[in-house]
Amino acid sequence: MAQADPDIAALFAPLPPAQASNVVLSEAREVLGHLHRPIDAELWGSDIIGALSDGTHGADVPDIMAELTASLVPAAEESATPEALALLRILAAIGSPALTAAAAEAAERVTAGGVADPDWAAAIGSPTVGKCWHYGDVGGRQESITVSFGYGDAEHALSVLIDHGRGGKIKDAWVDDAEGLLDKTWMAAENDPLIVFEPIEPADARARLENAVAAGECPS
């Protein structure tokens, strides 16, 4: 996972994970009512998890997921506001299996109490995967795997930079508008004979990304 925005991470720096729930709920109240696209909700949730990992004494992501399941999900359910429900939907989309199950069940109980879902709730976590590409140097030292995906008419792209000189670990990852990102990549490849840019099958992209995730992150 790429490091979170340092301004967000700073919110959690003084806190152990167990005490971060109130801060996350406060951020949710400030932000989630203004998000209208599933991609924005997913990115916000990812940034929060990254901030918790960066800011709460360097806790590992599995520990963060366990703490969110134990403390944040019950706190959000008790709050039972539209923003808290939105937070639960986000956690259900991007969390570990245990967190996903707990957040989804809590969200259903909140909606049963009469709280309305955000307009992106049905789409979050369920994009349609489009074309995939491989971009790298001819020596194979580094490569980027780009996967386009969309919700309805909106198309985005995820690029993951893999460093094979460092054990196939993930060096960086980012999300952008698909058309803009691919245009930039095409231009870079056309101007450099040592760059390879080619389409690959989604199954191939998935296998390469799974290997990179299993290898872990490059040390910062």
Task: Describe each PLM feature range.
Residues M1-S220:
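Non-catalytic terminal/accessory regions
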